[in-house]
Amino acid sequence: MILHTLRLRSFRAHAESEFDLAPSINLLYGANGAGKTNVLEAVHYLCLTKSFTASRDRYAVRKDAPYFEIEGRIGQVREEPMTVRLAYVPGEGKSIFVNGAELDRLADIVGTLPVVVFSPEDYDLTAGGPSERRRFVNNILSQARSVYMETLMKYRRARRQRNEVLRSYKKRSAPPPDELLAPWTEKLVGLGSRIVHRRQQFLQAFADDLEEAYRRIDAVAERPTIEYDTIADLAPDATPDAIEDEFRAALARKQGQERDRGTTLVGPQRDELVFRLDDLEVRRYGSQGQHRTFAMALKLAQYFYLQQRNDTEPLLLLDDAFGKLDAERTGVFLDLLRSDAVGQSLVTATRRGPFEPALNAEPASHRALQVRPGGGTAAVTPDPEYARGEATAANGAASAPTGADAASTSRD
């Protein structure tokens, strides 16, 4: 599936913007601060109901607006697309609609159109704290299997309840009675063990995708691997029952510390992933180039993994992903975007120069949109030169469209 059209209303810099998108490369280019990243963020909201930044929903509402709304038409290239609309009202929350009917849960849309994001913040994936790497795994597995996301949400609720019991009795300077703590402990063990087991299975399957992705990006013969540091020294093929037994035993060993600190100290919320190139631990000893290459390989491997396990090609969002790449790796990625291995992509850049060969080679499959700030919003128009070339390719001879004929418009 692809995203055919996108409409933003009162979202970030966009008062009201509409986009007609091509089935392959869609280049959004313009000056910094023009609103390019906002477009990718809106697509991420539509696919996963949240931003790929750390920003809260209320900050995405345009100044002085009462809400924001994002709408997209999603479907196969030659089939009637469905209309997906997400609305957010501060104080009321988010709602999502498919063909006008509101879904019971926001989570029900996740996985409909899988999405993979490349951004400058990917450096945090290899250099940041463990939570960045857990978030990466959760993102992949939630899009691949809805049952994983449901289990994760139930686990978080159970952990919050267990922590409330621990905190309340910490204030009383007394251990919580078993009849209060034990039910939440058992629920935590059951749900947490399923999460750990699924992560183990995922990392075993993901290893081949990571090697393939790294090989495509870098010709250096380094072997990327991921070590999984979880509840205890579990065997990679540990059964769910074995994981439950170890989880329960680990909680028993930490019982006193948990009472003193008023929080759960064991579980998948403390998992760590260790990235290595051969024997080199990337987070501690990797060069900036190795960090950047490993992070890009992880995201490309994510694309391959979701591509194999979903009924549709993932959508690639690349936010200034080429800004710090050398010419050779930029060329490698552009070739990949143009190939049959990758479906639709939305790419932001400050200039269109590096993309000219791809844009000119297949004008029916690619599109260039220039994003310019205008009147406090982001005015989006097809690039005149590109539009002229596209029209010529389609009709043999045609003049460039005027601003009134633009396929993508933005208005206050």
Swiss-Prot record:
Biased composition range(s): Low complexity: 389-412
Record-linked SMART domains: AAA (SM00382)
A cellular component annotation (GO) from this entry: cytoplasm
Record key words, sorted: ATP-binding, Cytoplasm, DNA damage, DNA repair, DNA replication, DNA-binding, Nucleotide-binding, SOS response
Subcellular location: Cytoplasm
Alphabetical list of Pfam families matching this protein: SMC_N
Binding site for ATP: 30-37
PANTHER family recorded: DNA REPLICATION AND REPAIR PROTEIN RECF (PTHR32182:SF0)
Annotated family: Belongs to the RecF family.
Xref: HAMAP family: RecF
Protein known as: DNA replication and repair protein RecF
Originating species: Salinibacter ruber (strain DSM 13855 / M31)
